[in-house]
Amino acid sequence: MRDLPPTVFIVDDDEQIRRSCEALVRHAGLRSEQYSSAHAFLEAYDTARPGCLVLDVRMPDMSGLQLQQELNRRGAVIPVIFITGVAEVPEAVEAMQHGAFDFLQKPISAQGLLDRLHRALAFDAATRASLLERRKMQARFDSLTDREREILSLVLEGLSNKEAAARMKLSARTVEIHRASLLRKVGARNTAHLVRMAMELRAPGTEL
């Protein structure tokens, strides 16, 4: 999915708004998909698809805020740009507090929307690249043996090879070998780098 070009998803019950946004997106050379309701979008959307979401705050059946909350529940990282009327600014503020990327007041400014779309798409690409790297890092930690995990836990306690060896009733040389294997497997440059990586991941099997 990450190799797919980004898509601008437009969700609004107002057909005229959808058409206007679609024309603007197409003119900018971007892909788009339009949905007349939050439910229709949820049925079609795969969270692995890159892009951004242009979303009306108030819609019948399921509001934009409710859709945002459902996407958060599903772990979606797609940036959301809310479209609001003057009377809907409080809802837009609430949306921002729940992680919305930005909001745009009606009547929609073409340049304002384009600027937000480009920033949102760049943000989405950076976020997905970061998540991909994190998954790769997690996979490296998951490949550790039970002994390496035990040593990792002691490293995070700040124990030296000699102290870890005494705790584990092993020779310092054996601990040194396992520690070197641990660093190599996870791709850590040194012990300080290893600790930073483990703290970032809160890796399973470590007592953080």
Short names for language-model regions:
Residues 59:
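Receiver (REC) domain active-site loop signature in two-component systems and cognate sites
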Residues 1-9, 15, 22, 37, ...:
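Non-catalytic signal-transmission and effector/linker regions of two-component phosphorelay proteins
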Residues 88-90, 104-117, 163, 167:
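C-terminal output helix
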Residues 56, 84:
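Active-site residues of response regulator receiver
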Residues 183-208:
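Basic, Lys/Arg-enriched C-terminal extension of HTH/homeodomain DNA-binding domains
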Residues 9, 48-54:
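Active-site beta3 strand of CheY-like receiver
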Residues 36-37, 63-69:
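Acidic catalytic/metal-coordinating carboxylates
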